[in-house]
Amino acid sequence: MVLGLEDLETAESIQGTKDGRPLNIREGLAPAFESRPSLIQAVDCQQVPGNDRLWLMPGHIGLAEYEVTLGIAQELSGSLVTLRNLPGSMRYLIDKTAASYNIDFVLIDMSPSLGAVNQNLWATSDLFLVPMHPDYFSTMAIKSLTGVLPKWKNWADAAAGMQTLQEAEYPFPARSPKFLGYVVQKYRPRAGVPSKAFQTWVDQLEDGVANIFIPALERCGLMLDASVYQSGGYDPGQPILQMPDFNSLIARSQEHRVPIFELTADQLEQVGSVLSSSQASQAQFKYLFEEASKRIIRTIDAIRV
């Protein structure tokens, strides 16, 4: 949506390099994964239209081609010197790019998988949010993450202590990701709250997070101090954000490449009571996003103190 890519011709605008700088994440990682005789450079990011403080590092479907190699490197990097540059390369690329644009916060939109790329991104992050839908699959995902994340944490701690990885061109960073919270999204509201069918799933998610997920995270040091959550103004066992389905607004948002709450009446192409209803929804969505943002900012400020 941000890039406005409509066909193969426009998609070429984020392929390869420009003036020696990579144009997407895969090209940015290529020096490490393809053993090129050059160091990783900052990616040439795209500025988000209408926001001079927001930049996008384009993704690339070809990043999946590095998944197997990265997985091998993360399992055997302690003994295979030839692979030692890979585990630390992703965070190095992110830091290098962030520094070139004076970026304060980096948000990573991860795919719903438990592969090596996500393991690496998670293990080298500072905070993580878990998106959920009020459905069966998310309730199962809670149990899956309860077992997987502690294992990833143990691997990351071991990797950070390996001399081989610390002597690499891109040293593996010592990080301890902390649970920032979770988001429940895409439910159908009725009278401003989830309908009874969706509320049943929301209740199950809250129960799973509070009684299964969070205790497991506490045991392996993946939770922030209780005082930090209090400073943020929320309980980590409750959703930091509950976001209803955007319905028809999302189509207009994508068409005009603006957030749903910034769509104008002309862009909505509606009149009368239909327009009033859409604008009321826009105001509600904006309020929800702002409240969640304030919670996150207060929490990060409390961490920095």
Predicted features and spans:
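P-loop NTP-binding core
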Residues: 1-305
